[in-house]
């Protein structure tokens, strides 16, 4: 209601406000992750600008991001490329490539496809999109077209990792693309043979993490953004010991790729003569771990807990305080890149004026209805405001980020996660995804707790187990957004999931 908005505005405007909103409260998700979410994110910046962003008590922060951990202790994250040698599409160039020199990997194919348009590329033969360009603002508007001039259409797909069905909209499109004659050959590298691996012509069996060496830090998306430690109020780096040899004919992902590269005559270039354990040690040596623990002790213990930084001895600058006081940037992070500053290096922000712009000059250079220069509310094309659709589909589905699975990482593996009723419910021998709804909506449809229900719209349908709760308002249904294994009951793309 309007009076609630006005009350919040008065309370906000009459005292110092520290904003704990955004997609990083639990490391992923948030209001910004929607079709028009950039408008919400811009609004948050404008609200903090009116408070005086960077002044004492006036700043951004998100739950665990305020934890007193040592952000300066370096360990490479999964967005930094690992052993790939790729400095174009990973974050390796920021630190890792200098710390861990490796042979470069360059993809000479300039053609690209937006992941959410793979189905259109295969079925229609053409599509377009905009890249994610973390290096510049203007680069995000560089529209590309597929197929690119001088390039052929995609005829083969090599699917490794991830879950397209669980993380794209209208996934029936993918079922049609996989079965299309336009896609001549599909290889899938899979551990569990779930979901889309069943569409493959050739399946390369990968082993589990218990059957190979690895090294990593808990809950860190490093490389995608600097100091990206989320979900935990501590830092733990662990070595993943190889417990047993790979079962059956399975191999580790590294060994599968190495075998292919040997067939192509480039095995030595790919491996650089190193085993998986050698690469683990290379990552160890590239980090700040050698200054705290020896490789032998780390290997024996299996983990290292990074102590919280003693801020009394090494006080850290406050984020954005330099901006509020008109000083040069003194925060220990490499962004923006030197050429990204709007004015002088380390002075001001990445905008063209170096200031917070309520009407960004850069957006005036592009005619993009989804990113207007003056921020405004852009209504969704679906919802209660769309009369015709709302008449046919009177329940609004709300889909927050999953709590118990991530890109199918823990779903469909027949583990103890299935016993968590918030995740799946056992009905007649099958574990169903959960859809929560208000009891009044359920009564009107004669739905009881844990009855099977079919959620559907014009794009497709999913069979779930209903969970009745007063925590939802009437007219609203809640189910986790993604990360369920694709399991159609009939013809793929033509039957409920």
Locate the predicted segments by residue.
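Conserved active-site and cofactor/substrate-binding residues in soluble primary-metabolism enzymes
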Residues: 3, 38-45, 169, 181, ...
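Intrinsically disordered or highly flexible coil/loop and linker segments, enriched in small
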Residues: 2-4, 11-21, 53-60, 163-166, ...
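Extended catalytic-interface subdomain
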Residues: 237-240, 254-261
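Acidic/polar loop patches that form or flank catalytic/metal-binding clefts of enzymes
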Residues: 6, 19-20, 53-62, 186-189, ...
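A glycine-rich, hydrophobic/aromatic-adjacent loop/helix-cap motif
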Residues: 3-142, 214-216, 220, 368
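A cross-kingdom feature strongest in bacterial/archaeal respiratory oxidoreductases
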Residues: 50, 99-246, 284-497
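Active-site rim elements
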Residues: 31-35, 242-249
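Short, hydrophobic/amphipathic alpha-helical patches that form generic packing surfaces
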Residues: 42-49, 258-263, 400
